[in-house]
Amino acid sequence: MKKKFLSAVLAVLTTATLLAGCGGSSDGQASSGDTGSKGDKMKVGMVTDAGTIDDKSFNQGTWEGIQKAEKDLGVEAKYLKPSGTTEADYLKEIGNLYDAGFKFIVTPGFKFETAIYKGQEKYKDAKFVLLDGAPHSGAKDAKPEVGPNTVSIFFAEEQAGFMAGVATA
């Protein structure tokens, strides 16, 4: 009985947290996606890693989130797939997005850590989101250096594992 009660409480708390985190603005109005400077649409770009945009993993999940922002917030979205998987390949596509006016760039995965480390310095007026990684120089024992124009997001996989364990108990 305790396990069922605990599972129910955790499910309610998880649902409430998700709904609160995904809720709209407090005034009930949707954002238009404008940058506010010239009425231009915000341009959100993504660089894929070695996978494809429909890989049922980080690339697909990231792109679907950007597409939702495009639909709900009116942002302009674009993704580029590098020709290779080196830091230089990633930096080239980051530069291509930047040159096309995409100053909000999302990269899915730790493979982008060194490219974002360099990109955040080179493109100081751009904003970067690095999923499941932290920018660093690539040197041995390098410490993460998240610039003021970068957000590094790590998923709390241990929480999902805990919830799965509770659910099966």
Residue ranges and their predicted role:
Residues K2-S25:
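Sec-dependent N-terminal signal peptides of Gram-positive bacterial secreted proteins and lipoproteins
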Residues L18-G39:
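Bacterial lipoprotein signal-peptidase II cleavage site
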Residues D34, K81, I94-Y98:
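Divalent cation-coordinating acidic motifs and surrounding scaffolds
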Residues V44-A69, K78-L91, G109-F112:
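Extracytoplasmic "Venus flytrap"
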Residues E87-F102:
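Short, well-structured alpha-helical segments in soluble
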Residues G101-G109, K127-L131:
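Periplasmic-binding protein-like
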Residues E121-F154:
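Flexible loop/hinge segments that line or gate small-molecule binding clefts
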Residues I153-A169:
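Hydrophobic alpha-helical segments within soluble ligand-binding/sensing domains
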